[in-house]
Swiss-Prot record:
Binding residues for heme: 343
GO cellular component: mitochondrion; peroxisome
Name assigned to this protein: Catalase easC
InterPro entries: Catalase (IPR018028), Catalase_AS (IPR024708), Catalase_clade1/3 (IPR024711), Catalase_core (IPR011614), Catalase_haem_BS (IPR002226), Catalase_sf (IPR020835)
Organism: Trichophyton verrucosum (strain HKI 0517)
Gene: easC
Ranges for region Disordered: 459-478
EC number: 1.11.-.-
Amino acid sequence: MAPNAADKCPVMGNSGEKCPVMSSSTQSRGPRDIYTLEALSHFNREKIPERAVHAKGTGAYGEFEVTADISDICNIDMLLGVGKKTQCVTRFSTTGLERGSSDGVRDLKGMAVKFFTEQGDWDWVSLNFPFFFIRDPAKFPDMIHSQRRDPQTNLLNPNMTWDFVTKNPEALHMTLLQHSDFGTMFTWRTLSSYVGHAFKWVMPDGSFKYVHFFLASDRGPNFTDGSTAKVDPNDPDFATKDLFEAIERGDYPSWTANVQVVDPKDAPKLGFNILDLTKHWNLGTYPKGLDTIPSRPFGKLTLNRNVKDYFSEVEKLAFSPSNLVPGVEPSEDPILQARMFAYPDAQRYRLGIDHLKAPLRRKETACQHDLGPEFEKWLSQVTSEAWSHPHEDDYKFAREYYEVLPEFRSQEFQDRMVENLCKSIAPGPEELRKRVYDTFELVSSELARRLREGAEAIVAEKARPDSPSRAQPGQLRL
């Protein structure tokens, strides 16, 4: 049969060359249309495994500009010199669910930034909360599974979440925030993000400071009359579209970079463990009675360019908290130490062993200063296996978050959080509900009472024969 005209031939393979293609697909001795075979084989392999967490996401390019001199605490080339600019790419994401899920799910939100510095890539891998559910990395798989779909029904099941929380009280602090208005979707443009972990900024002489840095949205969380902006339930990609369209029309979102600083000699005196990821560095809101760790603004991140090809420019991005540059070192935080292995290992599975064509090398700056026996004793205590067990601070931080909400936001803000918790608790069996109430009794008797009364009222209402709805196993988490 006659070949197709070259100008009608699809571009095949990596060469991009056009050539005549025979229209016959098979002959008596088998397939001969190698171009069709090549196209089919490429199609079969064009997708890659989705991320184990943070599968649903979007991204954009931008730049970071230094806005303040922090050379007294910092020896990082990218941050030295007011006005210095660095190009970057940012990826936003939800955490627990799959790639096709909604932007508006009640979930942690991720904001990862890769800075293309003159000394290599520096990744800030952040969440929209300054703390996390766990401090023991061995619990991470169980924690994530508790937030995902029921393995039997493939529906979201709040009972799995509450089973985990009641057995791991360090998760109470995070659980309260997740069920408040902070846990619902704003937009990616109004999302603030926190690295959560302590890092070390190391000076040329080997001295260092513990630091926690974060990006505060210049638009702020878009609370209106104490509530969050509602996501269109018919548009699961609401935030993705909002970010893309804003950048296209020149309405560039921006964030102010801030850093909190702790001298290692002061760390044992703060009244809480700065290496415990279930606790935040107090900016002055809560807990009362603990030292405030003020922040210093030092830069501005602006996103000003959309990607052209999502798959190659965003889906294939590989972030890791181990991607550091000279002047930055990881702290002894156990979760951080585990993430520094888990992230690159996940990329090797998802993208292959050669996803880093030219592995980056950084010069180590050893922390050599002798900080004395008090610091060494504190460090050995707060990184010991015993510290992973429940203790009073796990309840204290959750308690003070609950109590500060009317003052920090509004009474209605606190009431909505309680209502969301009740709706999530109510579908569970009686034994699990009782365990939840007993757990919250250790946080606040008032909160436990409100949860018991609210959740049991929902249970009673749904048990009525004429109730329009009944609690179903695995129903959507509210």
